[in-house]
Amino acid sequence: MTTQGRAVGYCVVAALQDPRKDVLAIRNLFPDRIAMRLDEPEQVDMVLGDGARDRGAACELISPDPAVGAGVAFVRLEADPDPVRVRAGWVTDADIRALADACIPDRVEWPEVAA
């Protein structure tokens, strides 16, 4: 399912917070992998595959400061063993409020309806 799912229009997404060795048995079932900030260098290879840390995926060096490290990850695709550093857009709560305020239409006064 994880390797052929795209052909029929579905995908399997799995997430974990503790990349210990007990997940190694299923890790290879997922052809594409994403690793965000990790605690230890050894965890990088546990998530992205053997040698990923040596090929540049320094996930333990991603900053815990949201202004610097939010959304930063390393991606390893099935077709390429070399991890790529990516960053998803980071939207603050203030940004969301400003967008919502900008999209709210002007209030319309509705006439009273007799009951």
Language model features with spans:
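Conserved ATP-driven motor cores of ASCE-family P-loop NTPases powering translocation/secretion/packaging/pilus
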Residues: 8, 14-105, 111
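Conserved catalytic/switch belt of AAA+ P-loop NTPases
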Residues: 1-7
